[in-house]
Design a protein with these regions (language model features):
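Extracytoplasmic ligand-binding site segments that recognize negatively charged/polar headgroups
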Residues: 140-153
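Cell-wall glycan-active module
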Residues: 1-112, 127-134, 139, 154-228
């Protein structure tokens, strides 16, 4: 894998991070046990605390309306969708994971079940180390997702945005993470001003964020409640 990474343009820091990885049993355990995506929509909303996310989301939007308005002006994505994703993924940053990002992604790349899917994200993670966006010690979720909205590294590297103007892209910074989320959705085909409920044009873009139907439905419903 090191030779492949070098061929993809990964530098010394990234290769060093790759060589320091270990096999993550916690990652494999989590990958084999994603029960919540098999729930009914009603149970999924209950288990994920949808009412609390909506309540906190409305409060967050009311406290910082200019920030969310600026994101919608720039990318066309309404606040409700971004806030719902933020709440669903990390409880608004309250828990962003406890697993080494590079080791998690390397483990999933090694694991033959979905190697082809995770290999580009491993390259992305190593390039992020090279760029100083993360370090070999950075922690995230069990599948290597990182930051406030849990981006896989390949997407974080490709779509990352400096949302607070400090010259860096840091997905552990809320402004950067939400701007990056909005940019990702726009780049995936979000149509400003169009609806995002099931059957409307932008619902298909929520599918680009997460492949689970129940998750897509939950984000659409919570987003509408927050925006309403």
């Amino acid at each position: 894998m090191a030779a492949e990474a070098k061929a993809e343009g990964v530098g010394k820091r990234g290769i060093d991070a790759l060589m320091a990885t270990g096999y993550s049993k916690a990652t494999i355990g989590a990958d084999r046990n994603q029960k919540s995506f098999k729930y009914s929509l009603e149970k999924f909303l209950d288990v994920r605390g949808a009412d609390a996310i909506v309540s906190q989301g409305r409060s967050r939007k009311a406290k910082n309306p200019d920030f969310y308005a600026s994101l919608e002006a720039a990318y066309g994505v309404p606040a409700g969708v971004l806030i719902a994703i933020h709440g669903m993924e990390t409880g608004f940053g309250s828990f962003m994971g406890d697993t080494n990002v590079v080791s998690a992604i390397a483990t999933l790349t090694y694991d033959c079940r979905r190697s082809d899917f995770f290999r580009p994200h491993l390259i992305g993670a190593l390039k992020m180390v090279d760029a100083g966006m993360i370090s070999m010690e950075t922690v995230g979720a069990k599948h290597g997702e990182l930051g406030h909205t849990q981006f896989l590294p390949g997407n974080a590297f490709k779509y990352g945005v400096d949302g607070n103007g400090d010259g860096q892209v840091d997905l552990y910074n809320q402004a950067d993470a939400l701007a990056t989320t909005a940019n990702y959705l726009r780049q995936k085909g979000w149509k400003p001003g169009k609806g995002y409920q099931e059957g409307e044009p932008n619902f298909a873009v929520i599918k680009e964020w997460n492949a689970a139907k129940v998750y897509q439905q939950a984000i659409a419903l919570m987003g509408a409640r927050i925006d309403g």
